[in-house]
Amino acid sequence: MHWLEVVLLGVIQGLTEFLPVSSSGHLVLFQGLMGMEEPELLLDICLHVGTLAAVLWVFFAQILEAAKGFFRFCAAAPKGKAAMVQVWTTDQDARMALLIIIGTIPTGFIGMGFHKIADKLFASPVLAGAMLLITGALLWATRYVRTEGKLLPKVTWGNALTVGTIQGLAILPGISRSGSTICAALFLGVDREVAARYSFLLSIPAIVAALILEVADASAAAHPPVSMLLLGGIVSAFTGLAALKWLLAIVRKGSLWWFAPYCWLVGATVLVANFV
């Protein structure tokens, strides 16, 4: 693998991990264009570590507050159900922490179910193209979502389970994780900013779990030089940081649908190229 390919993959991962256009779908497509049979596992891990670092940087304060809230909820547990319910209803940081845990449960089950067939899924540009069309449709539909939604105290555990399920299904190449989860929250009536914040905080356990699985699989795999791995991770982190901040601004404006035509164009191009 050449240095330029590593930089390009870092840029693709950084942009598409956060912009609602599917990082997995684009990596499948670009790897096909570069003639790589399979992604090099350790490089893929470093690319995801880079984007994880971007999320941790942007949301560090919220992560810290959510952790404190979770411990307050745990401290209330010995006092009985009434005390736990009070924390759930009045402590927004504790509520966010619990919503993340609840949403992670279906994501984990779906991820484990797909883990054994992930290689086959990621080898299919046709599947990525078709799923990009679906991603585009979801993004376009956000044009019709009301401008003011429910704030965090009104977000329910059922909402969290739904968004977590959607996040699990986003393992399919071409389905944007950020796009599908933000869209799901918006369709459930959640406020734009809360939807975006919850989507990215919910991504952290999923990314960490996926990295753990990949590290276990990568122990005996060949890998590029360490310098290339570091380069890919750094490029991914800085590109991801810029993309994440841009997307948050776009979500606040209610302009997620801007990305729909791009998803349709790329998805249709892939399908035509594979069937014509």
From Swiss-Prot:
Bacitracin is thought to be involved in the inhibition of peptidoglycan synthesis by sequestering undecaprenyl diphosphate, thereby reducing the pool of lipid carrier available. The keyword Hydrolase applies. It catalyses: di-trans,octa-cis-undecaprenyl diphosphate + H2O = di-trans,octa-cis-undecaprenyl phosphate + phosphate + H(+). GO terms for biological process: cell wall organization; peptidoglycan biosynthetic process; regulation of cell shape; response to antibiotic. PANTHER family: UNDECAPRENYL-DIPHOSPHATASE (PTHR30622:SF2). Catalyzes the dephosphorylation of undecaprenyl diphosphate (UPP). Confers resistance to bacitracin. Belongs to the UppP family. This is Undecaprenyl-diphosphatase. The chain crosses the membrane at residues 1-21, 41-61, 97-117, 121-141, 155-175, 200-220, 231-251, 256-276. The gene is uppP. Its EC number is 3.6.1.27. GO terms for cellular component: plasma membrane. It is an enzyme of class 3 (hydrolase). It is found in: Cell inner membrane.
